[in-house]
Regions:
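Short beta-strand/turn micro-motifs at beta-sheet edges
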Residues: 2-6, 66-67
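Beta-hairpin "wing" of winged helix-turn-helix
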Residues: 57-74, 79
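N-terminal helix-turn-helix DNA-binding core of bacterial DNA-binding proteins
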Residues: 4-50
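Amphipathic alpha-helical dimerization/coiled-coil segments
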Residues: 86-122
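Residue-level detection of the helix-turn-helix DNA-binding "recognition helix"
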Residues: 35, 54, 58
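Accessory beta->alpha helical hairpin/"wing" motif in late/C-terminal subdomains of nucleic-acid enzymes
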Residues: 80-84
């Protein structure tokens, strides 16, 4: 299932911040993780992901650096900043409140809150 653009605008940034919480990742790795770990629901193409990454970096929620991979190829790695960690904590609380509210009015089943936790990265 594909998510509508407006929902993706809200969920995309928090999903990227969460994936970067354990450690840095490069763009293709992030795109791949978004697709596989969300069952394709939050899959993003590069034309969506990279502007999102640049926006998060402009807000100082993530930082990037170039690094050589084992293949001697240069890759841009993204990492969560302290400011990004704080924002992620705030957004987690907001998403929990939103899911709770939608559950209370019957939009989501009561079991929806159980699946909020993501499995550990990597």
């Amino acid at each position: 299932m594909r998510v509508e653009r407006e929902l993706m605008r809200g969920a995309g940034p928090v999903a990227v911040l969460r994936l970067l919480e354990p450690g840095e990742m490069y763009g293709y790795e992030l795109a791949s993780a978004l697709g596989t770990r969300t069952g394709g629901v939050l899959a993003m193409g590069h034309s969506t992901l990279y502007p999102l990454l640049y926006n998060l970096e402009a807000k100082k929620l993530i930082a990037s650096r170039w690094r050589r991979a084992e293949t001697n190829r240069r890759r841009r790695y993204y990492a969560l900043t302290d400011r990004g960690r704080k924002r992620l904590a705030i957004q987690r609380d907001q998403w929990k409140a939103l899911v709770g509210a939608l559950t209370r009015i019957g939009v989501l089943p009561d079991t929806a809150t159980v699946s909020l936790r993501m499995e550990p990265a990597r």
